[in-house]
Amino acid sequence: EGATTTFNGNGGPRIGNIFSRLIYSIKFGSDQILFSDRVNADSQILYDRSPKERVAKVAPYLPLDGRVYPAVVDGRVKWIGDGYTTSSNYPYSQKTDLAEATQDSTTISSQTVQGLTDKEVNYMRNSVKATVDAYDGSVDLYTWDDSDPVLKAWQSIFPGQYHPMSEISGDLMAHMRYPEGMFKVQRQLLAKYHVTSASQFFSGEDFWQTPVDPTESKSEQSRDVLQPPYYL
């Protein structure tokens, strides 16, 4: 016999009364919401089940890293992600296409890892860490770079939205890692800007190149699908 459980979180609007059930039955085109005996006074509709979607609803102005990962934090499963502050108006700085810089074999073949948004920037900082509770979907945003002026501007617009870094528990801190999307952008830029000689730089000498993923098929390798970074 299968085990059952009752959701005790506060994850969405309640549909216990007949009017709410009727409205949502029409919205989703499902008569089960209206007539099923499994829908009771405590039932809820849970929207935006993806961790990235939930963070984007809370902070739509933050570009989010393409990978979120689960961890057991203080006895609860949390999805952890990275938020960036960006700008395209930083003086005397080359612009980088985020979508192009973060595309590799994982973003092409995986359904869970995505590249960054399609925009050109010349300023990028990993200023925010986000967690999403896997049970009730609650979102917490933490400041990761207190000196970032762009984040300070957002904090002044939305006071109280962010927890200070000091509130990150030791258990959560142990699971923090370097953001994958930022690493991809940095490796593309460092391929050229590690050169310190002006003559070598302008002649294109000693530039590095991210390798093609050797585990991909020959057709994918012919398209120069790049090897992704990985954690040790």
Regions from the language model: what does each represent?
Residues 1-232:
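Soluble extracytoplasmic regions of secretory-pathway and membrane proteins
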